[in-house]
Every structure is written in C-alpha cells, then in structure tokens.
Design a protein with these regions (language model features):
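Single-pass membrane-anchoring alpha-helices
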Residues: 2-38
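Membrane-proximal alpha-helical anchors
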Residues: 32-51, 80
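Serine/threonine-rich low-complexity intrinsically disordered regions
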Residues: 52-77
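Beta-rich carbohydrate-recognition and catalytic domains
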Residues: 79-113, 118-129, 133-173, 184-223, ...
Length: 469
C-alpha cells in the first residue's frame, strides 16, 4: 500500500468513526429527552392535585469530535414537601428570657408614615416569625389618627409584617378586623378576622389567602377572639372566641378549624367563670390557653383543649401570685385552682402564663392597678399550689413608671424542643397621655433561654413632645 493509499485509508477510518460517534450522540440525546418527558407524562397528577417534585436523574454528555468524554450525573434538588405541624417535642427548659425584637414604631413615626395600631401579637411559620396588629386605617402623622382610642371601627384591618419590621405604608392588610387571631399549620396561614356591628359581627376564616368559612355573632354582643396566635396540631387549628357580657356571664366557644373550614364547635366547660383574650400554646397532644377573667377573678383562667375528642376543661392558674391587672398586692392576694379569687375581678388585661412541671412562668404589669411596667418570674409550685408565693428568676422588662399594655405568648419549634416567647404591647397616647390625640403602640419581644442574661428596661421611648399631635 503506497503512502497515498495509507492516507486515504486512515482518513476513511477516522471519518467513519467520527460519523458513528456523531450518530451515537444524537441517539443518546434523543433517548435522554424522551425519557425526561415520559417521566412527566406518566407521573402527571390529576388537575386538582399539586404535582410533587421528585428527584430526577439528568444525563449530560459533552462531545468532542472523535473522542467521547465523561458523563456527569446530577440530582435535581426538590423543596421539602410541607407537613402539618404536630408540636410533639418537649418544652425547652429555661432559666429566664432574653431580648429578641423591638420595633420602635412610635419613635419612627415621628419622621415617617407608620400605621396607628393596637392589639399586637407575634406568630411564626416553620421558617420565620411575623408580627401582627390591628391597624386603625391611618398613619400616625395623619389627622385621621385623632380619636383612635376606639376599639371597633369599620376601618380597622389586620396588619402583617416580618418580626422587627414596623408597620409602614407598604404593609400587607390581611383582612378587615377589629379582633383577630392567626396561626400557621405547617402548610399555610389561617387568619380569624372579626368585624362588623357590635350586635351582629362576622368572623371570617381566611386560609392560604382565601376566604373559606365564616360565622355570625351568636350572642349579639361583641363577638371577639384571642388577639394572639391560635394553635394548629396535625392540621387542626383551635381558636377561643367569646360573645356576650364583658363584665358578666358570656358565651365562650372553642372552634376547631381544618384548612379554614370550621369542623367542630365546643362550648366552654369546667369551672372558669369568664374567659376572654386567651394566650394559647401547644401542649401536645392538646392545646392549653391562659386567659383573662374580666368579671370575677384576678387569677387567670386556664382552658385545656383536647384536639382529638373536642373536649374542653377549664380552671384557674393556682399561683398565689396572680397575673391580672388590677389585683391586690402580693402580700394580701390569694388564689384558687378551680374558681376565681373574687379579688379586683372587674376589668383586666390580656396576659399569659405557662406551666413548667408544677411551677409556672408568668408575666404581668408591675403596677397592681394600671398598665405600667412589666415583669416576668417563675413561681415554684405555682401550677399546683394556690398558696405558692415563692418567686424566682424575676426580670424587669419595662420599668414601673413606663407604660405597657397587652401581652401574649407564642411558641417556636427548635431542633429538640419547643421554646416559649412573649411580646409586650407598649401603648402610647390617649387616654393617659393627652399631649396627643391618637392612641398607638410599639412592641418588645423576649424568648426563653437556658443561658445567662443581664438586666435592663425596654420601654417604648418616644418623646411625645416631638410627635404629631
């Protein structure tokens, strides 16, 4: 074979190999694409179902003429499917509470457009915490802010922001409400929003951004709810609602809600005489609430909710150091585990407490007769003994001379346990401060800690002389 024939032969062989490789790559590409689309064809869900993301193997072949290179295998990363929360972890052991968040809304409103609010609270989804409040349909530096001490108007809406973000003009108005509760079941938010006439109000149940159910006032006397987070366990959410006399016998019901739909209603049973503005927390397998007795007791009512059989048991926090305002001073106060103590029972303020074995953690105003100052502490045997007055681990959150307001609890699930946190409403303006014509608030938030902590005071801090009148 002469040199020219050798060159022609080698060229022919190379061309043949290249052609074969080319067609092999086309075949591999066609097979890969076909298999990819076949997967979605065979796994496509019905029209009314959400398609779940599943890991997919994708082959990518990098080709150069003549030579076949390595094939790389990649996994498609899918979001973890949402699951209902069950809150089955134990409660975290704590030594006290550490500072977590403060929104400074009133101070900031001196130089910007911040909503006029009251009745704030905090609740968390599995990833983030959010702050809520009932807006008054106006900003503070707006003449509509005059006379916003009123609780119920058609302009009030439920506001929602990430925790620590003040309610600015871009804040989402979740629903129309002058009383509310919100909670996340692990998949979506549920909002309970009450508005309308005092004698014929409507509660709307909004789930995942859609109105799902509603209920009308059953006693025609200011239907109202918690003003803090509800609780969802395995897809069933519970909310405590009261309708009727604010200083006498009222009609309290516990609603069980699944994806926004009311599936059951239980009447309050047990020994609690008057129940309003409950602060609820998951106590697996049920829900426990500590509430406000606006009629007979300065000791706080307890409502225990059984998720499975819808049964309700109510009683009172035993602690001899009581949590409501007004109340008697600690040396002369008394309590009872089953009944109201009949001490300074009229009026009151939303508050919280939670059990820790036989002990109880609680927060309350420092002043016994008005909403001034705020403190937290643990009462040894305060969950089981009405004579218990041994207080430990006391912390001042707001000094005695500074204003406070409502307070409530929210729960945060950690890797190994469930932590309890609380917020304090810091009310400013009317009726107590007449330099201005409005009433609004900021908040401060603390969470349980097993570590060490110092001292301080975290009041609202706004100078009303610098504020819009």
């Amino acid at each position: 074979m002469n040199p020219n024939q050798k060159i022609i032969t080698i060229g022919s062989v190379s061309l043949t190999i290249s052609t074969i490789c080319f067609f092999m790559q086309i075949a591999i590409l066609i097979t890969t694409v076909t298999l990819h689309f076949k997967q979605y064809e065979f796994n496509s869900p019905p029209n009314n179902q959400v398609m779940l993301c599943e890991p997919t193997i994708i082959e990518r072949n990098i080709t150069e003429i003549v030579y076949l290179t390595n094939t790389t295998i990649e996994k498609e990363i899918c979001p973890k499917p949402a699951e209902y929360r069950n809150w089955s972890k134990p409660q975290c052991g704590i030594t006290g509470f550490a500072p977590f968040s403060k929104d400074n809304s009133i101070r900031l409103s001196a130089g910007g457009d911040i909503w006029v609010t009251r009745e704030p609270y905090v609740s968390c989804d599995p990833d983030k915490c959010y702050q809520f409040a009932l807006g008054q349909g106006t900003t503070l530096n707006n003449v509509h802010s005059n006379n916003t001490a009123r609780d119920r108007t058609p302009y009030r809406t439920l506001l929602m922001n990430e925790l620590g973000v003040p309610f600015h003009l871009g804040t989402k108005q979740v629903c129309i409400a002058w009383s509310s509760s919100s909670c996340h079941d692990g998949k979506a938010w549920l909002h309970v929003c009450i508005t309308g006439d005092d004698k014929n109000a409507t509660a709307s149940f909004i789930y995942n951004g859609r109105l799902v159910d509603s209920v009308v006032s059953w006693s025609k006397d200011i239907l109202r709810t918690q003003e803090s987070e509800c609780v969802c366990i395995n897809g069933t959410c519970t909310v405590v609602m009261t309708d009727g006399n604010a200083t006498g016998k009222a009609d309290t019901k516990i609603l069980f809600i699944e994806e926004g739909k009311i599936v059951h209603t239980s009447k309050l049973s047990g020994s609690a005489q008057h129940v309003e503005e409950c602060s609820c927390y998951p106590r697996y397998p049920g829900v426990r609430c500590v509430c406000r007795d606006n009629w007979k007791g300065s000791n706080r009512p307890i409502v225990d909710i059984n998720i499975k059989d819808h049964s309700i048991v109510s009683s009172y926090v035993c602690s001899g150091l009581v949590g409501d305002t007004p109340r008697k001073n600690d040396s002369s106060s008394s309590s009872h585990c089953l009944d109201p103590n009949n001490e300074e029972g009229g009026h009151g303020v939303k508050g919280w407490a939670f059990d820790d074995g036989n002990d109880v953690w609680m927060g309350r105003t420092i002043n016994e007769t008005s909403r001034l100052g705020y403190e937290t502490f643990k009462v040894i045997e305060g969950w089981s003994n009405p004579k218990s007055k041994l207080q430990i681990n006391r912390q001042v959150i707001v000094d005695r001379g500074d204003r406070s307001g409502y307070s409530g609890i929210f729960s945060v699930e950690g890797k190994s346990c469930i932590n309890r946190c609380f917020y304090v409403e810091l009310i400013r303006g009317r009726k107590e401060e007449t330099e201005v014509l409005w009433t609004s608030n900021s908040i401060v938030v603390f969470c349980g800690t097993s570590g060490t902590y110092g001292t301080g005071s975290w009041p609202d801090g706004a100078d009303l002389n610098l504020m819009h009148i």
